[in-house]
Amino acid sequence: MSEQCPCGSTLEYQRCCEPYIMGTEIAAKPSILMRSRYSAYVKKNVDYLIATWHPDCNAEQWRDGIIQSFSNTTWQGLTVIAEMAGDHDNEAFVEFIARFKDANSTQVSAMHERSRFLRIKEHWYYIDGIRPSVGRNDTCPCGSGKKYKKCCGR
């Protein structure tokens, strides 16, 4: 039976993010890399996550923490908001909201980030991200429709 890709596309996993995670294809755009990284979190593939961090990040140092986070987090969904060009051809940004449940909570939380990607030769890499601030009276980014202060901002 086919499995829908965790990244939120309408494609089957085998035809969407799996080829990137398995190393048989290279993500041609930052949004593809971001979606495949989300799927790697869902699939608990620490090797792909580390390989797709920019080399300057020395991501190997985070391996144990990433592995530990796998047992504490259940990913609930991904919404890509926008993909934007950077200051040069080898820089781009992807804004997204990733919804998740922490093992210590029954509440769905959300991570809203504007991720920065840099290209080295033909490969895109995640380097860092900025989390936009959410006002207490803003709509919660988790998608509940509630105000932030009554939802994830408690």
From Swiss-Prot:
Name the record gives this protein: UPF0225 protein YE2246
Superkingdom of the source species: Bacteria
A UniProt-annotated Pfam family: SEC-C
InterPro entries: NTF2-like_dom_sf, SEC_C_motif, UPF0225, YchJ-like_M
Species whose genome carries this gene: Yersinia enterocolitica serotype O:8 / biotype 1B (strain NCTC 13174 / 8081)
Stated family: Belongs to the UPF0225 family.
